[in-house]
Amino acid sequence: FKTLRIDQATFYPLMASPHKKSAMERKFNRVDTSREKRFYDIILRSVYNDGYKASTAWCFSRGDRMIDEYIIDYDDYVGIGAGSVSIVNGNFYVNTFSLPRYDEFISQDKLPIIGWRKLTDRENLRYYLLTRLFGLSVDGGKFRERFKTDIHHKLGTELRFLKFFGLVDGQDTLGVTRKGMFPVNIMMREFFTALNSLREYCIERQI
């Protein structure tokens, strides 16, 4: 990709649902993640040496322009389309994965939501932390603005863990270190793998 002199490159980890993973292993071989960190380190070394900067744990760009489907600029967001998800006021919503059902909902002026769950306070805080870690920076000021409290008070255990292992540094604004890039990549991969499992379940049952 470097020979093409492209401005942005995104490297996605394997996020297969259980059935997809089984199908891949039948066709190719057992999915082996033992060398995943080594490959990720090769990617980091290669892009950094060529002047790219990390925008997320997956996306690297040169210059100011950057497009990433996984970047979240707002704390709440609404997903549009079949199979999309939303988070609004601490509630997690899932749209129907069935195109006919989606069309039926919309034609009747109904929301296509087929499931929702109120996140616990801890889940909401940890989800916020995960998305900020993925974007490589956790701003304590924005956290106070959002949750009306100090991040070290609400997420002290999590932050001490991250700092102890050298995955983040800083005080009010925490930056993900190079050592922390791979663990953050894994955490986000597991989050989307879980979503893909939900997607597979709903599609199979035309929910």
Where are these predicted regions, by residue range?
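Short, amphipathic alpha-helical interaction segments positioned at domain boundaries
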Residues: 181-207
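A short, conserved structural fragment
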Residues: 163-173
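Long, highly charged amphipathic alpha-helices
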Residues: 42, 154-157, 186, 190
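Residue-level detector of family-conserved "landmark" positions at structurally sensitive sites
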Residues: 11, 57, 154, 171-172
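C-terminal scaffold of the Radical SAM
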Residues: 1-149, 206
